[in-house]
Amino acid sequence: MKKIIIFALALIMTGSIQAQDVITLPQPEVSKLSMSLGDALKQRRSMRSFSEQEISLQTLSTILWAACGVSDPKTGKITAPSAINMQDIKVYVCSKDGVCLYNAKANTLTKVSGKDIREAIAGKMQPFAKTAPISLVLVSTKDSDRFPNDKYGAMDAGYVSQNIYLACTALGMKTVARAMMDYDTLKQELNLPETSYLELNHPIGY
């Protein structure tokens, strides 16, 4: 079953399923995040080596939900705090098969590119980052009308980043928050407008 799920994700990302660029994620397994907060905080580490073990779509769904998924469908509240409740952090899921954008409200992944951009995420100084099977790229949106400066996007990215750390710890996985990346290449590959800012990235694996 796990291999089938991974294969389905690969097909979506590479465009092998021509008529469908959106995949509905499995419901997150919140029960898998049952480690106590105290234990998660004690065990949380920044890890910089990863095995070749793939990440299932089910596990990815759980991590994305913990990052900034919808925690209360009635109110639209998400798992991470957000300045002025803008909920502006976009999470791009990057793997060898391409890039997808996470839609928290729909619980879906939308294909953005079929290219492997993990080398640009790693940058020149930290090649270990491109060995992780998946990297999450956190992007904020600048809004000059509501945000007088860029600190609010950085704050929101920090909240999401901590959630990713704690979720990976609870799931027995590895991650590290990084600000180093090839900003110019990534902005081009992700087709980001000038109002978007690359905040952080999280290589994730085992």
What is the predicted function of each stretch?
Residues I4-M13:
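Sec-dependent N-terminal signal peptides
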Residues R44, I63, V91, I134-L186:
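Small-aliphatic-rich amphipathic alpha-helix that forms the alpha element of a beta-alpha
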Residues V22, P148-D150, Y206:
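A short, structure-level motif marking secondary-structure boundaries and short turns
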Residues N191-Y206:
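A glycine-rich helix N-cap at a beta->alpha junction
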Residues Q20-A132:
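N-terminal amphipathic, basic helical "cap/leader" segment at the start of enzyme domains
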Residues G15-A19:
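Sec/Tat signal peptide C-region and signal peptidase I cleavage site
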